[in-house]
Amino acid sequence: MKSLLGTKVGMTQVFTETGKAVAATVIYVEPNKVLAVKTNEKDGYNAIQIGYETVKEKALNKPLLGQFKKANSDPKRHIKEFRDVVAEVGAELTVSEFEPGQLVNAQAYTKGHGFTGSIKRHNFSMGPMGHGAGYPHRYVGSIAKGRGGSQAQRVFKGTKLPGHYGHELVTTKNLLVLDVKANENLILIKGAIPGPKGSIVLLKSAKKVGHIVSDPQVVNYLANKASSSEANK
């Protein structure tokens, strides 16, 4: 199992030999510094603790600074544990952990939309737009919680109402790695990844085994990338 923390740069396109445009998301991966190693004997599970995104010392409190000094590392903004990853303290995990043609899972928070109404949040229909409608056009309407009978005099949990929309942790699975630019710390992934530009993305090697890329043009693109990288070596 391979894992990395990265930053979403944005989206672009890569072109196959036949001119087909393939949408790709660009992820910048600053080297993930290993801060600590958890073992099954001492901690009950195997994992490594990494730090990501270098910050100034004044941005952190003293307990966190002591943790970084113990690991002989620069202060980092984000600390994350990766289960079942083998590495030593002080090592750096880079984009070279992944290679073109590999499948990965991307986990990130979706774009936040703040407090929104039920039409945008739950795709409700609008009310009549005629002048005689009288009723506000974007109201929720009745939620059928009146008196008597089977109608409870309360609002059940989960009722679709206005509220906070977006900023939810979402995992997109089995995304194809199109290219890895180790000298620029960039990785190109086929398709879209949740979140706005500048958001933190967790990349993990996909658990799905035996998946075959069905698009022959993308297969040829990856084959050409592999042959060119071997020639450069």
From Swiss-Prot:
One GO CC annotation: cytosolic large ribosomal subunit
Keyword field contains Lipoprotein: no
InterPro entries: Ribosomal_uL3 (IPR000597), Ribosomal_uL3_bac/org-type (IPR019927), Ribosomal_uL3_CS (IPR019926), Transl_B-barrel_sf (IPR009000)
GO biological process: one example: translation
Superkingdom of source: Bacteria
Alphabetical keyword list: Ribonucleoprotein, Ribosomal protein, RNA-binding, rRNA-binding
Pfam families listed in its UniProt record: Ribosomal_L3 (PF00297)
A GO molecular-function annotation: rRNA binding
Family annotation (PROSITE patterns): RIBOSOMAL_L3 (PS00474)
Assembly information from the UniProt record: Part of the 50S ribosomal subunit. Forms a cluster with proteins L14 and L19.
Record family assignment: Belongs to the universal ribosomal protein uL3 family.
Function: One of the primary rRNA binding proteins, it binds directly near the 3'-end of the 23S rRNA, where it nucleates assembly of the 50S subunit.
The protein's name: Large ribosomal subunit protein uL3
Species in which this protein is naturally found: Ureaplasma urealyticum serovar 10 (strain ATCC 33699 / Western)
